[in-house]
Every structure is written in C-alpha cells, then in structure tokens.
Amino acid sequence: MFSGWGVRTLAASMPGYNPISYHCGSVWPHDTAIVVAGLARYGLVEHSQRLLSALIDAGVALGGRLPELFSGLDRAEFACPVGYPTSCSPQAWAAASPLLCLRTIMRLDPWVPYGKTWLAPTLPEGIKRLKVAGIPLAGSRVTVEVEGDDVHVEGIPDHIELVTEPRHPATAV
C-alpha cells in the first residue's frame, strides 16, 4: 500500500485500484500520519520513520503544504507526488497531519489527570536536532530539545512525573 510518498487507500494489487481515484488508491496525508503514529505506538519505529520521511519528502515536493490528497502513483515512476485534480489545499486535516507527526517523533503522551507524561523522542534520519517550545501541559509551557540521544526538557510542572521511555500500548495508570 506504500506508494513511496505515503499510504494508499487501496493496495495496487487489489481489484478496483485506481491511483487517481478519490478513495481507491490515492494517498491522504492524514491517513499516513495516523499510520505513522500507530506504527510508532506499537514499537515499529523503523517502519514509522520510513513513512514519516516519505510524508516529509512529499510536503517538501509540494511546496511545504500537504493537500487533502494526492494520487497514489508510485514514487519510482514520478519525481514528486502527482496531484489530485480537485484536492483542497490548504485543507484542515491535512494541515494538522504534521502536528501528529511531530508528536509521534517526540513520542509525547501526556496523561495529565494521572500526573504522568511520557516522552521518548526518536529523530528520523536526516533530522539531527529538534526544538519545540511552548507545548501546553497542565497549565505550563514546556520546551523540549533533542539532539541525537540527548534530550533536555524545561517547564514540566512539579506535579507531573516525566517518564523518559515510550508508553507501552497496554499501560494502565
């Protein structure tokens, strides 16, 4: 289902596949972002980062703005994602996709009512340093800086325990 730019809505091997149809083979950035997050959540970080890198590449190739969808034509055949004729750009959930991807890179999982926040960043290849400032958390603003394996966090409220490992999918509080 991977086109080289993102996850298609239908695999190329399936009957009915049409890479330039709305729902039968196109790539929707928000679907890809959800898959990126799910793969990382269940420990498949390398797979997650492969999709994340492809989505970043698509965004760069499309001028820094992810559209609602683009065609599912294979990256091996085209140097940039092929647009979908009536795709909206900007489009709300496509515009939100990079935020989910950023949270996924940080593996940020706040559970404020229970007094815990998990943070275990993993930078994808090509990103050497990341700084995110002003993250709202329990009435405070948090800054996270990542460079390689070094992580520096400022602004965590005293009543929040910072857990510096990924939260296991089945973790109960």
Question: In which residue ranges do the predicted regions lie?
Answer:
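Extended glycan-interaction surfaces of carbohydrate-active proteins
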Residues: M1-V27, V60-G83, L99-L102, M106, ...
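Well-ordered alpha-helical segments within folded domains of soluble proteins
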Residues: G25-R41, S89-R103
